[in-house]
């Protein structure tokens, strides 16, 4: 069973969105999908808006579409796009 490293960019719907609540919900949903080694980084975009960059490891057979759909359905997340998708070795 191969594993992959994902980097997903989640865009909140406004600069006032609670980023910590989004991260907590994302971590919970990712864990239910079998993701491990979940980490987050906030990346400034413009006018006070920050993207949340989520990095995690997940079994390859889960697929990438389910990840985008699940994370984009979090309240106050306007979009979730996969920025990186790499197969791991070892």
Language model: regions and residue ranges:
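Long, contiguous binding/interaction regions
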Residues: 1-90
